[in-house]
C-alpha cells in the first residue's frame, strides 16, 4: 500500500474519528433537520495526499454540499487535523471503506453544564464561517476589524482596547468578529482560556447556578478566563441580579488584566435600564461602531462569498443584489443563498429576471421608505446650507436652487402630493412646488453636472 494513500489504517481510523467529530459539529451548528437532509448519509471513504474523500448518496446532494458547505467542512477537518488541505466529494462508494455517521448524540450547547465550559470546548460555540480571513473589510467596519484583530493577536497580553465594545445594527458583523477572535486565539494560543457566549446564556447559566447552589463554581469559571466575550449585552438590561453578577465579573477580570469583548446593538451611553456603573465601565476601553454597509462593501461581501462557494453569478445579478439588499449582511448572504439554491433545485440559469422573481418578497421588505425630511437633510448637507433654509422664503440662488432640487427629489422619490410637499417646505402652495420641479427639469436638459449631481443624490438616498 502506498504511504500516500491511507485506507482505514491507524491514521485512516483517525480520519474516521475526525469525520465523526466534524459530523457532530455540523449537527450542532445547523440543527437536526438540515443535518438529516444533507449530511446524515454522507460517508467517509479514504484520505489520499492530504485530501479527504467523502461519498454523498446522490449527485444532487453532492453538488449541493460542494456549492454550499465544502468550505465549512474543510475548515472543520483542518481544526482537528491541519495536514488536511482539501476535500473531495464523490457519489461512488469504495467497498468496505466507509464510515457513515447517521446517528449522533443530540447534545448541543444548551446541554453543556457549567463545569464543561472552558477553553477545550469553546470550539463548539464558534461558527466555522466566521474568521478574520473571510471578513470583508470596508469603511463601515474597519475600526472594529482592526481592534478585534489587535485583541486576537495580543499573545497573552491585554490589548489597549480593554474592554473592546462593538456596537451596531443586526447582521453587520459584530458576532463574526467575536467568533474570529475566538478562532484566532484557539489556533495561535490554545493554552489561553476563552469563553464566548450570548448575554442570554450568561444569564441562563447564572440562574441555573443559583438554583443548583453552584454560584461559587460559576464565579470561578467566568473569573478565571483569559478572554471573556459576551454577545448582545443589551439582553441584561432590566435584569438586576444578572447585572450585579456581570458587574463583579467585569471588575475582577479587568483588575487582573484579562481581556473582555462585548457586543451590543447600541452604544453604552444609549443603554436603558442598566446601572450607571456598568454603563460607565463598558466605555472604559475602545468603543467601535459597526456602521451600515455601503454599496462597495456589499459588493465585496458578495464577491467573497461567491468565490468561497465556487459558483458563477452574472455581474448584473451581483450588482442588483448589492444595490437592493441594503439592510444587513445576513440578509444579503441569505438572498445570495436563496438564488443559488433555486438554481440548483430547478436547474434554471441564474439571470437578473429570475433573481428579481425569486427575491420579490424580500425586495419589497427592503425597499427603503424615503421621507421629505430625509431629502431635505441630505440636500442641505450636500449644498452646505441650513436645514431651516428649506422652509424659508429666501431667494438667494445658493439657497433657492438646493430647495428646488429638494422639491424635485421629493416628487421623484416619495408618494407625496405637490400640496403635501409644499407643506414640508414652509407651507408653500402646490404651484410653487410645480414651478420648482419644472425649473429643475429644464436645467437637467442641458446641465450635465447637475444631472450627475441629482443622480448621485438619488443613489445616496436610495441606498
Curated annotation (Swiss-Prot):
ATP binds at residues 171, 173-175. GO terms for cellular component: cytoplasm; plasma membrane. The keyword Nucleotidyltransferase does not apply. Residues 83-124 are annotated as: Domain II. Belongs to the DnaA family. Residues 344-463 are annotated as: Domain IV, binds dsDNA. Keywords: ATP-binding, Cytoplasm, DNA replication, DNA-binding, Lipid-binding, Nucleotide-binding. Oligomerizes as a right-handed, spiral filament on DNA at oriC. It comes from Rickettsia africae (strain ESF-5). Its main location: cytoplasm. It is found in: Cytoplasm. Plays an essential role in the initiation and regulation of chromosomal replication. ATP-DnaA binds to the origin of replication (oriC) to initiate formation of the DNA replication initiation complex once per cell cycle. Binds the DnaA box (a 9 base pair repeat at the origin) and separates the double-stranded (ds)DNA. Forms a right-handed helical filament on oriC DNA; dsDNA binds to the exterior of the filament while single-stranded (ss)DNA is stabiized in the filament's interior. InterPro entries: AAA+_ATPase (IPR003593), Chromosome_initiator_DnaA (IPR001957), Chromosome_initiator_DnaA-like (IPR020591), Chromosome_initiator_DnaA_CS (IPR018312), DnaA_C (IPR013159), DnaA_dom (IPR013317), DnaA_N_dom (IPR024633), DnaA_N_sf (IPR038454). The gene is dnaA. Domain I is involved in oligomerization and binding regulators, domain II is flexibile and of varying length in different bacteria, domain III forms the AAA+ region, while domain IV binds dsDNA. This is Chromosomal replication initiator protein DnaA. GO terms for molecular function: ATP binding; ATP hydrolysis activity; DNA replication origin binding; lipid binding.
